[in-house]
Every structure is written in structure tokens, then in C-alpha cells.
């Protein structure tokens, strides 16, 4: 396993990784559960325009219009895109108030370290290849964040987030 893969999956448990089809918002997706337990991998999203988007399972993104010289995010190799998580693409940081009046800072999809609270991560891509959905659940906070990536001829790269109670 590469050092990059080890950084994002330090305690690899391949038995936890499963795949299945599911319906999400009325569309068919293929979901990989516990995707963070395997080495990072590269994906592409397609659309009806000249926009291209490549995204790593770490969250790093490269995208542009027509060709590499018109990149919106830096056009790098797969390993550099994977390492770019948190610098390219999206970043979510949530301040969560607890019943005892304390505040917890939660950064979904960040690299986990020993001693961090348990998280459940899933990754789903629709069968047309137009939408990619990252989901992280923090059971201790009772929260789930779903982040969807899509391309749009009109709006370009579209990232949407949905925070729900579980």
C-alpha cells in the first residue's frame, strides 16, 4: 500500500468494504460502504457540456472546460489530486453544540487518526455517471453530512451539501 493510501486508511479492514445498488432521490446508484478502508481511487463525472471533472475518493478535485489549459482546479496527476483533499474541491467544517453546552468541531471526510470518534463513510455514483455522493455519519453527534458533486452546462461544477439528524 502506498504512503498516500496508508494515510487515508491506516487501519485497513477490507471486510468492512461492501458494494450495493440503492435508490437515492429517485435515481439508481452504486454505493461503496466504508470506501475509506481501501486505498484512494480516481473517478470521473460526465455531463452534457464541455466540462470535465475528476475526483479522488479522498475528496481532491480537478476540473475544467475543454482541455487542461482551462482548468478550474489545478490539473494534476491522480496522486497529487488525492493529496489535494481539503485544498482543492470542497471543505466542510461544522461547529456542533452539545447538550452540555460544549462545542465540537467536526470536519467530515478528513483523515481520521487513532482516538478520533468513529465515522461511517459511504460513496455512491449514479449509473449514468453524472452524480457522485459522499456521505459521512457521526453517530456520537447524531448527524450525517451528504455531499453531492455534479456538472452543469450552466453552472459548471456543482457541490451541494445536506446535513441531517440520524
Listing of model-derived features with the role each one plays in the protein:
Residues 1-166:
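Anionic coordination/interaction segments
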Amino acid at each position: 500500500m502506498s504512503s498516500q493510501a496508508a494515510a487515508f486508511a491506516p487501519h485497513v479492514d477490507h471486510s468492512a468494504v461492501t458494494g450495493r445498488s440503492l435508490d437515492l432521490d429517485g435515481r439508481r446508484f452504486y454505493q461503496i460502504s466504508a470506501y475509506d478502508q481501501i486505498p484512494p481511487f480516481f473517478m470521473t463525472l460526465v455531463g452534457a457540456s464541455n466540462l470535465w471533472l475528476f475526483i479522488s475518493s479522498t475528496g481532491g478535485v480537478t476540473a475544467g472546460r475543454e482541455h487542461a489549459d482551462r482548468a478550474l482546479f489545478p490539473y494534476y496527476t491522480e496522486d497529487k489530486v488525492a493529496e489535494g483533499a481539503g485544498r482543492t474541491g470542497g471543505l466542510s467544517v461544522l461547529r456542533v453544540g452539545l447538550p452540555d453546552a460544549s462545542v465540537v468541531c467536526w470536519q467530515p471526510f478528513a483523515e481520521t487518526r487513532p482516538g478520533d470518534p468513529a465515522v461511517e463513510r459511504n460513496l455512491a455514483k449514479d449509473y449514468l455517471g453524472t452524480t457522485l455522493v459522499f456521505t459521512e455519519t457521526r453517530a456520537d453527534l447524531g448527524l450525517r453530512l451528504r455531499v453531492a458533486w455534479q456538472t452543469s452546462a450552466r453552472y459548471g461544477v456543482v457541490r451541494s451539501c445536506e446535513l441531517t439528524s440520524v
